[in-house]
């Protein structure tokens, strides 16, 4: 019962305030560690980054496991709703949907307004983007974050319960903070690779949810498209979305997906939101079935 209740909370209320959000707590608690690691040599930065990840993941796994065990022992009328409240911050769909829809709405006013709205959900420089670039980036963010913020946490919840979802969100948060080249090269290397490992299966599952297709030729095409991105996982949901919409998606200077296709229009953004919404609902149903099966086996 916890998962459908958590899904209902997301649809009705979206994200809790940062002061009450466990993922925000993860980020704020590790920010001082990151600043310290940047002062270290490459070797010590790598060791410290790996140690911080391992200690943090272990603490979160143990805490989430203890909390889940305690809530399960309560009456289902109390335990399930409380577990849903704890589980809800581990994934985010409504916020992602609304932010991407807001980009297109802002573009209706001006390109500058569209850029400002887009900057809320991406870290890249948006000042150089025209209207087409804003739409392409919004669709890319929708597809990639459908995996990172929704499908992957649900996948790990289905596999390992609340500890699985919490550890994944920790790994993804640390990757978002430290998983960059340049000055974060060594401090964030462990975090980046850990996120790659934990996201490997969910990213391909997200691609399947965005475009269900059993034809081998399609998966060969998608695999080739996914290889264009520097991430071993991000190209799968983005490539699936590009092929499903029949549009080009690109990050200038880094990659182009479905290069021969036209740029997306406002209608394509609306279609992308519909496809992602359908994928999100299917992901919830699959996670519920998998969770029920795991409970029966245990």
Identify what each model region corresponds to:
Residues 168-177:
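Alpha-helical scaffolding flanking metal-ion-dependent phosphate/phosphodiester catalytic sites
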Residues 1-166, 179-298:
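Hydrophobic alpha-helical transmembrane segments
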């Amino acid at each position: 019962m916890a998962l459908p209740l958590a899904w209902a909370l997301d649809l009705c209320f979206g994200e809790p305030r940062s002061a009450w959000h466990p993922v925000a707590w993860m980020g704020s608690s590790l920010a001082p560690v990151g600043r310290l690691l940047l002062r270290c040599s490459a070797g010590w930065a790598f060791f410290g980054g790996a140690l911080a990840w391992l200690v943090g993941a272990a603490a979160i796994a143990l805490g989430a496991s203890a909390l889940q065990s305690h809530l399960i022992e309560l009456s289902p009328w109390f335990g399930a709703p409380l577990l849903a409240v704890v589980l809800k911050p581990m994934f985010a769909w409504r916020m992602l949907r609304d932010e991407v829809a807001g980009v297109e709405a802002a573009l209706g006013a001006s390109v500058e307004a569209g850029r400002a709205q887009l900057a809320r959900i991406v870290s890249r420089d948006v000042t150089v983007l025209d209207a087409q670039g804003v739409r392409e980036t919004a669709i890319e963010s929708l597809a990639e974050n459908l995996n990172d913020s929704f499908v992957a946490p649900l996948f790990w919840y289905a596999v390992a319960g609340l500890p699985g979802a919490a550890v994944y969100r920790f790994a993804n948060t640390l990757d978002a903070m430290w998983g960059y080249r340049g000055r974060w090269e060594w401090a964030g290397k462990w975090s980046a690779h850990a996120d790659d490992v934990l996201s490997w299966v969910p990213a391909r599952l997200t691609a399947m949810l965005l475009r269900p297709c059993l034809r081998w030729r399609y998966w060969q095409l998608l695999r080739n498209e996914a290889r264009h991105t520097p991430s071993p996982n991000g190209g799968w949901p983005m490539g699936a979305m590009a092929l499903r919409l029949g549009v080009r998606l690109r990050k200038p200077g880094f990659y182009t997906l479905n290069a021969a296709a036209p740029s997306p229009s406002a209608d394509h953004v609306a279609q992308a939101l519909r496809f992602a919404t359908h994928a999100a609902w299917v992901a919830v149903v699959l996670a519920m079935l998998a969770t029920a099966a795991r409970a029966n086996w245990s």
